[in-house]
Amino acid sequence: MQDLRLILIIVGAIAIIALLVHGFWTSRKERSSMFRDRPLKRMKSKRDDDSYDEDVEDDEGVGEVRVHRVNHAPANAQEHEAARPSPQHQYLPPYASAQPRQPVQQPPEAQVPPQHAPRPAQPVQQPAYQPQPEQPLQQPVSPQVAPAPQPVHSAPQPAQQAFQPAEPVAAPQPEPVAEPAPVMDKPKRKEAVIIMNVAAHHGSELNGELLLNSIQQAGFIFGDMNIYHRHLSPDGSGPALFSLANMVKPGTFDPEMKDFTTPGVTIFMQVPSYGDELQNFKLMLQSAQHIADEVGGVVLDDQRRMMTPQKLREYQDIIREVKDANA
């Protein structure tokens, strides 16, 4: 058992020594190859940076414009950066799934001229002197911003179209107001006939003998045209003021009225007449009322309707109108 343990210890020590030697040899080899391939690693790191910038620009929706970072640090700084593991590889895993559009680009090789390496101050001035490449960045962005104002400008177009038919309404011209036609004064009547009726009640007739007595008592005298007239004087002298006729055609009377009957009589006065027409009208109204009371009839107007105060005022207005027209 002790021999087996000793053998295992020796084998383990040999394995450990072999691992140490292999690790040391591997590290030496990698370090020598790192210094040997330093320019290639620098180019690779720049290409990785370019591909990273392109992926970022693609994610942001930017077109062909790219911003390349040019490393003009001194040789010592580059060697120091080469000795360290490249930091660009730390940003590649998030974009490892993205497929680069141009894995190998020749323009970056031309953009890294060797003569810029001895300039130590340019790495500080180069970021400040980049407004020129930044200007193209706004050009691809402008197409994205341009579509936004388009609906804004297109919106007023229907408003203008809706406002165009309203232009004639915006400035309506006042329609000429038709001047009212001058009201022509109604020509005054220069003559008129005032008519009253004394009629029996409905379904009856006036008795001739009673009618004759009432007519004579009212001052009427039988005369021209076989009708009765009321003169200025009760004895029949002077001009006639108004007359009385039969309501039945031809309107005449027979002096022998014992067997005479009629539905009524008509009293009429022509204006203008002799004397005062209004006084003659009052006398005419009194005569009609007297006859109606004597024969048991009623006084009617020219339309054979019941006489009313309004109708009497209308008769008086007609008389005044005729008097004014003949004044």
Curated annotation (Swiss-Prot):
Ranges of Acidic residues compositional bias?
Answer: 50-62
Swiss-Prot/TrEMBL keywords: Cell cycle, Cell division, Cell inner membrane, Cell membrane, Membrane, Transmembrane, Transmembrane helix
Q: Which GO terms describe its cellular component?
A: cell division site; plasma membrane
Function comment? Essential cell division protein that stabilizes the FtsZ protofilaments by cross-linking them and that serves as a cytoplasmic membrane anchor for the Z ring. Also required for the recruitment to the septal ring of downstream cell division proteins.
Q: Which cysteines are joined by disulfide bonds?
A: none
- Which parts of the chain does the record assign to the membrane side Periplasmic? 1-5
Instruction: Identify the PANTHER family for this entry.
Output: CELL DIVISION PROTEIN ZIPA
**Quaternary structure note:** Interacts with FtsZ via their C-terminal domains.
What family does the entry list? Belongs to the ZipA family.
Residues annotated as region Disordered? Answer: 41-185
Location of the protein in the cell: Cell inner membrane
- Protein known as: Cell division protein ZipA
Query: Which ranges of this chain reside in the Cytoplasmic compartment per its record?
Result: 27-327
Kindly list the residue ranges recorded as spanning the membrane. Answer: 6-26
